[in-house]
Amino acid sequence: MDKTTTSDLVLDNDNIGSNAGSAQEPLTTNGKTSGVRNRYKQTVKRGRKGSQISPSKTYPLRSSHSNVRVLRSASKKKNETPIVPTNDNTAVQRVAKKRKRSKPLRPAPSRVLRSTSEKKNKAHNELLNDGAGVQPAEKKRKVGRPPKGGTPKDDYLMIRKRVRYVLNRMNYEQSLIQAYASEGWKGQSLEKIRPEKELERAKVEILRCKSRIREAFRNLDSLLSEGKLDESMFDSAGEISSEDIFCAACGSKDVTLKNDIILCDGICDRGFHQYCLNPPLLAEDIPQGDEGWLCPACDCKIDCIDVLNELQGVKLSIHDSWEKVFPEAASFLNGSKQIDASDLPSDDSADNDYDPTLAQGHKVDEEKSSGEDGGEGLDSDDSSSEDSESSEKEKSKTSQNGRTVDDLGLPSEDSEDGDFDPAGPDSDKEQNDESNSDQSDESDFTSDSDDFCAEIAKSCGQDEISGPSSSQIRTVDRTDGSGFDGEPNAENSNLAFMETELEQDMVLPISSKRQVERLDYKKLYNEAYGKASSDSSDDEEWYGNSTPEKGNLEDSETDSLAESPQGGKGFSRRAPVRYHNNEHTPQNVRPGGSVSDQQTEVLCSNSNGSTAKNRHFGPAINQKLKAHFKEDPYPSRATKENLAQELGLTFNQVTKWFSSTRHYARVAATKKENNIENHTAENNNNTNTVDSIQLRGSNDIVSVDRNDMVSEERTGQSNLNEGTPLRSDTSCGQSVAVTPMVHPENQGNDSSSNVRTPNAKSAEKLIPGLENSDEARRKAVQRELRKMKTGR
């Protein structure tokens, strides 16, 4: 709603003060429109220059959400003063200045104040362009390090800080050392690992800190000595005339009523003007009575001494000089900076004291001595003495006619061409003479050893010996004293050989193969384990045609256990079936073709032998042991000892043999009983028996005993006549029960029937695939026997 008025616009200060927070100001009119309250708003539109309020102009009423900005009072004082906006430009300038104070601008003439609205931006741009803008603000002072030209007060403050910091650092390092130095409760800290390098570093750091504190006190004493009054100015009572007192800061003696010179009551004996101090010393701050006053330097020294006494436990006073502060740090500083003065010339020596010939001759001696030590191989003591003598001769020769000559006979680098003297010594001749003298010395050196070797050679019936040769080395290696007449001669020759080798430093290498005698391993084995056959020889019997001796050894393994009173002996592992004829009990064949049960009996001859573990005793020893085992399986200790002495065995070996034989006899008896029971049960159930045939060698003949040969053909024919099918037993997982061979005289008493093995050829014709199955079984048995031998 728009309102018009013809009255003049009047500003009411009271209304402005009361309505400072509102966006509108009430104005009074003449009252022609009664009952209606006319409200008018004074607006200042930015961007319009010289806008004036006329009574005939219409002013629209706007809400409080309008973006038009008006002047408002910020405080009560401003509200009390009349605000008469005579010009819009002045109002805007005040707003701009107010913003300038709240947020200072950078002194950039191109930047202007910008508002959030476009109208405000236009108003500010026009005002600044007209020249009525805000003046640039002053540069803000940077906060950082103080200027380099510091005052004495700053120096004292830095000394305080430095001393306190270095003391704290030193206490830290001392605590580290004390932590490892103490033994702890009940000495437990002694077990800790000590960081030696770190502790050494801490000790060095402590000395460095002490030296820094000492340096700080030295600087402080130097500041205390500046402007100090001479002691001659003081009388015997310690008083000084006022005319002689001057200011230590400015050096002036002028004194005014408000700028008097005050003497320090410390140790510096200096005076200062009141206004020369920083900060100035006012009259009311001067101590009254007997109370003393200290200058800033003395005050700083007292503070540093108090901190030092508190943290380090020392007893220093203000009267002590800086040299008494940590005197042990002086040695550290001197040790790090001192130079070995032994290599330097004396102070009173001149330049002509230096003799270049001595230094050059010293270098030549070193080079020559090192060359002779590496090439000739003489003793170090003799070579050094000879080198020193030769060097002295060279020095005397080279220093002729006031010039220096090196080893090659050439003049020194600083000499001219005219210095050559044709009458001088010839260097080539000198070198030849020296080489000849060296050779003569060497020959003299080795003459004694040569004579000694010649005498030894004559005593041994040999030619003269000059040194260790390759032929002598070979004869010494190959012969064990056989080339000499007797043992004393051999010892003397070896002694001479060692002495000649020791006397010569370098022995030329021999360009030939090393003469090493081949070792007889069989002899060594026989010495260590006796003359019995070794395991390496037994391994050969697994492949190829075996000899009758090897077969007898395998047969003897079972025969040694077959003669036990229990009637047999069994193996806990698989038996070596290759050299035996196996009889298998009948098997239950399932519909699926798997073998449910398998038992094996091995028929063996009654030949002499031993078990796999006891085979190294020999057949004679095993025969005697088996005879005693038949008589008494549990012999007494005395019997065992007698057997051990008689057979040349130890008591433990005899005891182990009897225990193992008893064990395997019990196992064999158990297996035999189980086989008989199974055989009876299978016969009652009308099961078929199967005989597995093992082919041996190229002739496919299995030899059970030398005297008793069983043919496979008869057994196979009998089995065919009986109507029992033959099958090859391919199962190798079960153990083989070894049964004793039944002799003709015991056939009537033995309940078990003898099974004769037929010939392999007829069996192959009757049973297909028999050869392959027996080959697989043979390999499995070989593997088991290898395990038994290696596990021994």
UniProtKB/Swiss-Prot annotation:
GO molecular function list: chromatin binding; DNA binding; DNA-binding transcription repressor activity; zinc ion binding
Polar residues composition bias: residue spans: 15-36, 51-67, 716-737, 746-760
Please state, per the UniProt record, what induces or represses the expression of this protein: Induced by gibberellin.
Annotated stretches, region: Disordered: 1-154, 338-495, 529-599, 677-697, 711-792
Q: Give the record's keywords alphabetically.
A: DNA-binding, Gibberellin signaling pathway, Homeobox, Metal-binding, Nucleus, Repressor, Transcription, Transcription regulation, Zinc, Zinc-finger
Report the function annotation for this chain. Transcriptional repressor involved in the regulation of gibberrelin (GA) signaling. Binds to the 5'-GATC-3' motif of HD16/EL1 promoter. Functions as a positive regulator of GA signaling by suppressing the expression of HD16/EL1, a negative regulator of GA signaling.
User: What GO cellular-component annotations does this UniProt entry give?
Assistant: nucleus
| Record field: compositional bias (Basic and acidic residues) | 116-127, 362-371, 774-792
| Descriptive protein name | Homeobox protein HAZ1
Per the database entry, where does the chain bind DNA?
Answer: 610-669
Q: Does the keyword Iron apply?
A: no
The remark listed among the other comments is: Plants over-expressing HAZ1 show increased length of the uppermost internode and panicle, due to enhanced gibberellin signaling.
Zinc fingers (PHD-type), as residue ranges, are 244-301
To which species is this protein native? Oryza sativa subsp. japonica
Q: In which tissues is it expressed?
A: Expressed in roots, leaves, stems, panicle and seeds.
Q: Output compositional bias ranges, type Acidic residues.
A: 345-354, 373-389, 433-453
Provide the protein's localization. Nucleus
Asked whether the keyword Nucleus is assigned, the reply is yes
List the CDD domains hit by this protein, alphabetically: homeodomain, PHD_PRHA_like
Predominant localisation class: nucleus
Give the highest taxon in the source lineage.
Eukaryota
Q: Which family does it belong to?
A: Belongs to the PHD-associated homeobox family.
Biological process terms in GO annotation: gibberellic acid mediated signaling pathway; negative regulation of gene expression, epigenetic; negative regulation of transcription by RNA polymerase II; positive regulation of gibberellic acid mediated signaling pathway
Record field: compositional bias (Basic residues): 38-49, 95-104
